[in-house]
Amino acid sequence: MAIDLNRLRANFHVAVAKRKRADQLTLLGKSDAKLPSSPANARLETFPNPAPKRNYRIHFETDDFTSICPVTGQPDFARIDIDYVPDRLCVESKSLKFYLASYRNERAFNEAVTNHILEDFVKACRPREVIVTAQFSARGGIALTVRAEYPDKE
């Protein structure tokens, strides 16, 4: 039985590279991780896209989003949907959960929050395209939905 040393070396290097990428994820599998106090302290973690040559969509959604109205100080509740086509990197979902939770004490208008989420998402993973939709619960009888897209449509 002949052993292909080149193939063995290649498999070893692939396994080491995968382990290094997994080691870079600081939240996944860690039950003692603390929520960041603000979006500025939060970090969206990424991992390599397993199919970078294919256009496919990833959809995240949560109805557990809260930020603070900058005028009244009252909480604004929202459903956040993020739909994106990854390029080289994908966003790890637990880091996204922690990132979104970091807005709980953030005073900002709904439009600013939605656009900031989009900007941070694009900065983290440089997707081919992404749409962030934030459906804020009614306050004063009016519900508000904000949709921000990348790349900008002309």
Model features per residue range: what roles?
Residues 2-154:
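N-terminal intrinsically disordered, cationic/polar leader segments
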